[in-house]
């Protein structure tokens, strides 16, 4: 699947997989990305239905909240499974 060709998108899904949701700035800091770069990758993930973003007011400030969808969870889990299966065939 083409969406997994980007290391950044794989990292985003990996971080979100273990969380109920997170704020935009949390992802930006964890992945050391610019606003524009993160927005670009989130847009691609949203177009595939792998993540959802919404604006929420938290402590009087508007925050962008990101969460992985069920479709995104299944796709990421399958991607990791495929990687693990491939790694079993590697001889050192």
From Swiss-Prot:
InterPro entries: ArsR-like_HTH (IPR011991), WH-like_DNA-bd_sf (IPR036388), WH_DNA-bd_dom (IPR027395), WH_DNA-bd_sf (IPR036390). CDD domains: HTH_ARSR. This is Uncharacterized protein MJ0432. It comes from Methanocaldococcus jannaschii (strain ATCC 43067 / DSM 2661 / JAL-1 / JCM 10045 / NBRC 100440) (Methanococcus jannaschii).
């Amino acid at each position: 699947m083409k969406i997994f060709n980007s290391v950044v998108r794989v990292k985003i899904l990996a971080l979100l997989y273990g969380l109920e949701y997170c704020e935009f700035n949390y992802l930006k800091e964890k992945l050391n990305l610019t606003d524009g770069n993160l927005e670009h990758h989130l847009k691609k993930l949203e177009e595939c239905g792998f993540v959802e973003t919404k604006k929420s007011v938290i402590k009087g400030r508007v925050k962008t909240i990101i969460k992985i969808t069920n479709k995104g969870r299944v796709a990421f889990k399958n991607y990791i499974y495929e990687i693990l299966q491939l790694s079993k065939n590697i001889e050192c």
